[in-house]
Amino acid sequence: MYTSGTTGPSKGVRVTQAHAYGYASPAVIGRAQADDVSLVTLPLFHIGGQWAGVYNSLIAGGSSVVLPRFSATSYWDDVRHYGCTYTLMLGAMANFLFQQPPSDADRRHTMRQVLMVPVMPQLDAFRERFGIGEVATAYGLTEGSTVLVAPLGQARPNAVGLPRGDFEVRLVDEHDVEVPRGKAGELVIRTRDPWSVMDGYHEMPEATVNVWRNQWLHTGDAFRIDDDGQWVFIDRMKDAMRRRGENVSSFEVEREIMEHPAVLEVAVVGVPSAATEDDILACVVVRPGMQLDPAELLAFLDRRLPYFMVPRYVECLDALPKTPTEKIRKQALRERGVTPAAFDRPPRRVA
């Protein structure tokens, strides 16, 4: 099974039947039953579509409807036509659905459960508008199964739930030393069940050794543990930025940009700075029929973010580069860098 390839070339992950079952089991990521019909809009050559979509339903004795692609305009028509009752939905997909013009038919459908990854900030408004009864969320990876889970009814924005009992989990610094509670660190995992994580990367022995260093599987993702024990996703380690001596989460900057009414989609990346750290570039897709003034967007962010997290550059794009699984290819945006079309607000001097 190949990874999504968001940070570079896709890696072939050697998986076992136990690995696939542990990821897809309805006992882990939902309460699918024999009379359920899952809607699958993600490709079957990655774990989201195949394991969390089709396998999850088949293990429960249910059925799956596999569509060629996700479409925000026809989504609820498809749900009604096929009688779908639950689905795996990326947070970006939920946002696209939420941005569609309201309709009297928004609540006339059979969908009752959604596994949303990650949970969109407007979760309550989404559930109210579309009449979704239960929402769950989870964190998983091709290499290591479903590790963190917020069961149905317990999902909330910015958090991914609690560790599964059959995994050992730690948050560590760059030296693999466990960080204090409340501090951000890389999630590393070990399984208590044999064969429920990957056997290694296909024909990539050095990458296998690196990801398994010190006998822990390194996820490459940064988290912190909230006051209530919920695990909060911070960023991909490769997507995190360093600016003005501070660590900056692209995920947190994107979350605030998405609050602007003219923004349909955004990706934030670090670009080289003359100060040897990172400048921040926000690549924005504007909602159809609306306009966005980059200077106004930055003024909007000035009121919502610390100064060191506000982007220097803003560029409006027709679309963001994505993988077949609809994940944004940030590496492509980093390689593209700052173009002449980008709005540039030089950084303010700080005494």
Residue ranges and their predicted role:
Residues G140, G161, D221, G245:
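Active-site glycine-centered loops adjacent to acidic/histidine catalytic or metal-binding residues
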Residues M1-G22:
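Conserved AMP-binding A3 loop
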Residues K11-R14, V40-T41, G62-R69, A136:
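Short beta-strand->loop structural element characteristic of the AMP-binding/adenylate-forming
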Residues T3-T6, S38, L44, V79, ...:
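Conserved S/T- and glycine-rich ATP-binding loop of Class I adenylate-forming
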Residues E335-A351:
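Acidic/polar alpha-helix N-cap and adjacent early helical turns
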Residues Y21-V37, F45-T85, F96, Q100:
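Conserved AMP-binding/adenylation subdomain of ANL enzymes
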